[in-house]
């Protein structure tokens, strides 16, 4: 990047739309989850990663790497999930202070119920408004904005 990099009008417009649409989509999903009496979307992200990890679970630092949470946020969220019986913390045998986080049966059921609402929201808010080709193009373009880029 150059010292005096100034965004083009097109870059500013794209950025503004990306930020606004992202916020609107997340708010719509959050509203749908709340109407369904379900936990916030952030819970789904953690439960999903833990379910994908299987019985071995994940260490907190691995969850931070796989999600968008800062360390202090993930600690509070994990405490809440544990208090609600959705995850369990297990000691790491070769690390006296370390813990592995594993999803419980209740956590799997909560994730399943959340996905019913979340998946429907994705289908309506994104899949129902764009063609398959448009979705593929959007996925490709957004992948290029990632760091590092996702090229699939």
Model regions and ranges:
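N-terminal positioning helix adjacent to the helix-turn-helix/winged-helix DNA-binding module
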Residues: 10, 14, 42-43, 106
